[in-house]
Amino acid sequence: MAIRTFSLKLIILLCMAGQVSASETMITNRSDFENLVVEKKLKRFLISLSVTSEGKIKGEAAGRNVTGDWDWIDGFFCRTILWGKRELKYNCQKVTFDGKRLRFISDRGKGNSASFAIR
């Protein structure tokens, strides 16, 4: 009986997880992305970033300055970032929006993700 209850709870959780992702909209073009972020801050714990329409990224993360460049290529947000003195490799990311938060998924949507509140 305990196994059936656990299995049912697991199935319900998996279905709910699918519903959460289904509520996200993929951002597919530069103008939609810019309308969401330009003149706003992207925030998460210890990180505050600004993205400009001129293709620049600036802000702070964990007490270090962040600078970088970005472009929109083939439906993906592609960026280079310098975090303090450390250069993060060039990466193109899938971007989704759930109405409150932007989620960036590295490696063209196949890698790790980070969600940011828009303020």
Residue map of PLM features:
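Bacterial N-terminal signal peptides that target proteins for export
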Residues: 1-10
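Lipid interaction determinants
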Residues: 2, 18-119
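Bacterial N-terminal signal peptides
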Residues: 9-17
